[in-house]
Regions:
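Extended beta-strand-rich architecture
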Residues: 1-267
Length: 267
C-alpha cells in the first residue's frame, strides 16, 4: 500500500520509481520514504550496540612477541621485496638440484632482478647487508619478518610460510653474539631448552651451503628443526662484496608457534 501511495511499481525484489521522483536512486531512499509514510514515531527506538574490541590472533601475538624480542636484542627492522633474481641462488652457492630453485615465476616482472618469488629470505638479507657495507656503515644488526613462496602444484597457490631472518656484521659481531641473541629471542617466545647441532651434509636446510661449515649450526626444538645460524661462507661473502665477517640466522615462525609455551604459570 505504501508503495502504491508513492506511485512506485513493485515487481518481486525490483522497485521502479516514477519519472518525477529523480531523488529515488538506491534502496536507502526507498527505506526513507517508507519510514516517512509509516511515521518515524512508530519505529521503536533501539540502543546502539558497542563494537567489540578487536584482538590479535594467536599467530599475530606470537609474531609480535618475536618482533619485540628481536628489537630488544638490538636489531633494526627492514622490509625487502618478495621477488628476486634467479641469479641470487648462485650468489649463495645453492646446489643446482635444490628444491629452492623451483620458483613461482612472475608473468610481468619489472626486470630480471625481480622475476621470481623468493623461496628463501637469505639472499634478501645479504643484499641489504651488502648495501649497508657499501654505504660505509661500520656495524649493523638487521632483521626481517617476511614470507617465502614455496610452489606446491602447477594449479595451486604456493605455500607462504613466515620467516624471521637476522643479519649482522661489525666489530662486536661474532658467532656467539648471534647465538646469544637467538637464544634470548627463543626464550622470550616460549621455546625453552633448544639445542644446536653443527651443520653437516645431513642438515635439513639447503641454504647451509652459504654458511661457514665450521661456524654454523641447526637449531632444534626437541626433534624439530626450527632454524639455523652461523657465519657466512667467505666465498658467499665475497659474492656480496662484504669485506668483513658476516653472520646470519633464520627462524621458521610457522614451525615454532605450535611448540612455544605461551601460557605463563606461577608457583
Amino acid at each position: 500500500d505504501t508503495m502504491k501511495m508513492l506511485e512506485i511499481e513493485v515487481d518481486g525484489d525490483t522497485c521502479i520509481s516514477p519519472s518525477f521522483r529523480i531523488d529515488l536512486e538506491r534502496p536507502a531512499d526507498l527505506a526513507e520514504e517508507v519510514a516517512r509514510i509509516y511515521g518515524y514515531n512508530n519505529i521503536p527506538s533501539t540502543v546502539i550496540k558497542g563494537i567489540a574490541n578487536a584482538s590479535l590472533t594467536p599467530k599475530q601475538k606470537f609474531r609480535r612477541t618475536l618482533e619485540n624480542a628481536t628489537v630488544a636484542v638490538g636489531c633494526y627492522g627492514i622490509l625487502t621485496y618478495s621477488f628476486i633474481s634467479p641469479k641470487y641462488f648462485d650468489k649463495i652457492a645453492l646446489p643446482a638440484d635444490s628444491s629452492l630453485r623451483k620458483t613461482v615465476v612472475i608473468s610481468n616482472p619489472l626486470g630480471e632482478d625481480t622475476s621470481v618469488m623468493r623461496t628463501t629470505t637469505l639472499p634478501s638479507m645479504l643484499e641489504t647487508l651488502s648495501l649497508n657495507y657499501k654505504n660505509r656503515n661500520a656495524a649493523v644488526a638487521l632483521y626481517e619478518i617476511g614470507k617465502e613462496y614455496l610452489p606446491t602444484a602447477p594449479d595451486k597457490l604456493p605455500e607462504e610460510p613466515d620467516r624471521l631472518t637476522i643479519g649482522m656484521y661489525g666489530d662486536d659481531a661474532d658467532f656467539f653474539t648471534l647465538k646469544g641473541m637467538v637464544e634470548t629471542i627463543l626464550e622470550t617466545a616460549g621455546l625453552h631448552d633448544c639445542t644446536y647441532k653443527a651443520c653437516g651434509t645431513d642438515a635439513p636446510f639447503d641454504e647451509i651451503c652459504a654458511l661457514h661449515p665450521g661456524r654454523s649450526a641447526v637449531i632444534y626444538a626437541g626433534e624439530t628443526p626450527i632454524g639455523y645460524l652461523g657465519e657466512v661462507h667467505p666465498t658467499v661473502q665475497k659474492n656480496y662484496d662484504i669485506g668483513t665477517r658476516t653472520y646470519v640466522a633464520k627462524l621458521l615462525i610457522d614451525e615454532m608457534q605450535p611448540l612455544a609455551q605461551t601460557e605463563i604459570t606461577y608457583q
